[in-house]
């Protein structure tokens, strides 16, 4: 995230004297730039400027040569000899660039360097070293550790260097005593990855006077050669994108300008080097440092090429299959046809040589070296999606790609190149060309039709229409109209995130202050349904019922992979074909979305069991994703534009079905040991009871249908699982998990589970209110009925027959006995029910109850049931 230096910020906006980093953080957070951290210096003094009086080389037995030096550190810090006179400090230094007559940075005893490295007098190589001459890396100023810092070569002007005195505070000189503010920015506000952008936001927060540096730079930039009749361009540039992503060109502006007769030996000025280092970038060379500095200051990534190595035209194109590129970091990359490249044309072969991966990183060929005298400056505007994909594909999160993928100002290229050219001319004696080439295909910004009333409707803020206009103008928008409360607003070139009225409302709310939004309860709509939908109410009832049953709700990630498929006995390859695959999965070993909840819920149960909790009763409500391989392809739509109704319908048609499911897993003991009885392990009946409770709570008339063993899915026990049916509608499974699944997951034996398709289950309900029956005051008639039936007849089937025959006089029915044996015959079983009859209008006589009994017996005979004596 960006590091903010108050001294640099002052270049673009007025800040009060004595502004602290803590106050700066408070000011910026008001406009949405959050404080990540205020970084204090890792270095403490004393650290001073030293003058090397002498440096005597002393070869050592190990082949190394050290220098025994005497360094003048000023009267305050020099040593005192036996006579009480101040004399230079004796210091051992092994750096190869140490020599007499140089001014260096001396860390004195008591100083602490990064990594908690404490400086103390120590005896080494036969001398007492009373301090240390420091390198950039030792002070945390960069990566250079090839030698100590020689202030003569550290970017000071001749006059500044001569003014440096021994004993002068080097902490302040090198800004080692200054903190930095690191801020966190949102992906849609890429312009704040620059001091230009942060200064603008500080202005919005405090009202401080702000000057946009790009305005003056654009005015000074020369007209492109195309606008100067008869003037040749610096170098020909062609944009040839034959594979745009989502129809958006990978490059819509490429600005090229030449700087000739550049001095490759010129040093980066100290102020620029210091700012780059404090921003977290190392100083490389003047040419490279200038492009990096312009990027940090204005927000425009740039690239510098050695012009003498290039042959025009420069061609911006997509990569071809099989092409490779070795980038500046020395790594070779296999290119994708989606990658956008910068190429030149050696020997007339147009676009045949790759110079770099556009907007991400340059290649080895064409880079600026210590011999470069003529430079081609590139400032371009690249598509956000193209750059983001290339950076992630090749794992190159460069500073340039971070900015391009968030959106760069389409009007900034001439200003950035002008600034870079001026700096190279001033510090490198280069001669900027006056004939730049500007290939500009950027689309014209569209006006947004904006109603002032949207601010109150969306954000709840009462903002005066004139203030709305002022705010939009202040952020850079062009505002027209307003007489009738409606504006035509054109977003500035640096705000690609402003596309719709809601974006403008967000900006107004941000700058008025989120703390100014009144706290109000949204009013319920006057017309239509109010509150939860019927299905939402049913979902809550299901959750409440399972919680009352003693189960605990869980929420798992909906991601699955090969291990989950194998644990549940699924064929991984067959399951993948009908599963939704995630393009950029959170977990590499779980790249698919679940088709059932049980596999993901099982991972939560596993985690509990591994931590010693075996008695688990968890349930989860959530979506599953049922991919249809024959579904139409989802169309690719351009960004920044609201899709049409037809496009939305095409998107919807290609989406997978996403029904609501509820699933539960019960393991271990259903009942603990106690005074009422012994331990009872979980079995299929506990899962069935949970399903029955769900059905009873929402008023669903479910039936359990036990299929043949061969028809039971692989994850269920073939003899202890049943389909959950509502009439002819299949709504799920309930029973024990297959022993193989329990073993694979590490579950106790006989672990039970259920999974219901709530979308299908809710669809079977009429939605009509349940009519409560009045409580009858007449006495009940209780009878026990035992029937002999075939083994294939289920208790549920016979119960439905009894309910139908008894009619309105049936108050309750309960199965209390199932019996098989010689007494009932082979292939038969006995089912006994306790039934209660009660009339709402009279006392049932013996004749009434006998008639009901006969009706039940007659109806039961239709399915082969015989009443036992």
UniProtKB/Swiss-Prot annotation:
Cofactor: Mg(2+)
One GO CC term on file: phenylalanine-tRNA ligase complex
EC number, UniProt record: 6.1.1.20
Gene: pheT
Organism from which the protein derives: Bifidobacterium longum (strain NCC 2705)
Name listed for the protein in its UniProt record: Phenylalanine--tRNA ligase beta subunit
UniProt keyword Manganese, yes or no: no
Catalytic activity: tRNA(Phe) + L-phenylalanine + ATP = L-phenylalanyl-tRNA(Phe) + AMP + diphosphate + H(+)
MF (Gene Ontology): ATP binding; magnesium ion binding; phenylalanine-tRNA ligase activity; tRNA binding
Domain tRNA-binding: 41-162
Keyword Chloroplast in record: no
Enzyme class label: ligase
Record-stated family: Belongs to the phenylalanyl-tRNA synthetase beta subunit family. Type 1 subfamily.
A UniProt-annotated Pfam family: tRNA_bind
B5 domain boundaries: 443-519
Subcellular location: Cytoplasm
A Gene Ontology BP annotation from the UniProt entry: phenylalanyl-tRNA aminoacylation
Self-association and partners: Tetramer of two alpha and two beta subunits.
Cofactor note: Binds 2 magnesium ions per tetramer.
Stretches assigned to the FDX-ACB domain: 776-868
UniProt entry keywords in alphabetical sequence: Aminoacyl-tRNA synthetase, ATP-binding, Cytoplasm, Ligase, Magnesium, Metal-binding, Nucleotide-binding, Protein biosynthesis, RNA-binding, tRNA-binding
Binding site for Mg(2+): 497, 503, 506-507
